[in-house]
């Protein structure tokens, strides 16, 4: 089942309705509610009743499935393409946080800072049950559904936020001044840096384990990979997080991105990659989940 949040023409953006997407139509739920309320209530999605008359998807404005998740955890690296080498392995997920207020929906403009941005297509899960010290099986059963998340990043911010500190050299044991990479928080938390959508696909709908993931910017293929590249499954990530931080219904956990294409990178190091500084439309797609499109806004706020 595909559940979406939407408004009709002329309605305010925050007056979101909840509906079920079937083909080219969206059917509003009979009971006025939100996807967040549905997730938190624990009601079975297939028990939801809809109106008989549907709206054409092209005639509604889709919002993010959940306008303000309780918290958003983003897996930083979960594929070899993001690690930069096949000889690198991880023993556990690495994560960061995105502010819930950075969430926007399909079609919302992404304002590009002067240093540029890069997109990161990610499969994101909505947590459907309270998870605390959960096993992988318990975490799997606690996933409500999946959506597409763009973990927009301004990499220059973390370079600017680098700082020096005294650290012990692992090889020599000597304590010396070391330049440390800056935190990722600022680079990932500008307003609008977390587009999500176009809807949430309930976890019973399909198998997440081998879904094609792509990002396009106009005619440029920026990312091309698959969820089969994930080192840690969504359930393993959720289980790991729940060992130290309780996950609540309505939380979002994003599972990581894939590497950038050689066509997009050119001669750039992956850590330096940003999109060309021009306006255009980003199109992120995960097979079986959906296509998320957002225009880039350059040079104006």
Where are the regions that the model predicts?
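Residue "hotspots" at secondary-structure boundaries inside conserved domains
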Residues: 64-65, 71, 115-117, 239, ...
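A short, charged
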Residues: 43-64, 68, 162, 170-180, ...
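Residue-level structural signal for beta-strand termini and adjacent loop
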Residues: 32, 227-228, 298
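A conserved acidic, glycine/proline-rich C-terminal tail/linker
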Residues: 233-277
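N-terminal non-catalytic cap/leader segment that marks the start of a structured domain
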Residues: 1-94, 100-101, 114, 214, ...
